[in-house]
Amino acid sequence: MRDYLDEARRYYCNIVGKYGTQVQALLKKAATVEIERICPLHGFVWRRGIGDFLEKYQKWSTYTPEETGVMIAYASVYGNTANAAELLAVRLRERGVKTVMFDVSVTPASEIIAAAFRWSHL
């Protein structure tokens, strides 16, 4: 699953993410049956690691961050905001805080949205 986790997260967060309550209801129903495979309309068919996959859906559907850290998304026309964002990231890292940065002018929005689900602070 590890190889496909980033894409699974990106799909969930961008397509299914706003339906957390409905996903929770479905996960409750799914817990009462034996699942041999998951066949989504888009993406991979899951035959192995189904428990891990369902755990991720549980986490994502309750909007629980996967990691503690800060995601910094910025746009910078003249470079000043990029410099400020980098300075913020450096200061946070000096304090032991994990950080990830995204330049919104070059990073696909779907990746930024997925990261917003993954990290505890924006």
Residue ranges and their predicted role:
Residues 46-122:
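N-terminal beta1-alpha1-beta2 submodule of the flavodoxin-like/Rossmannoid cofactor-binding fold
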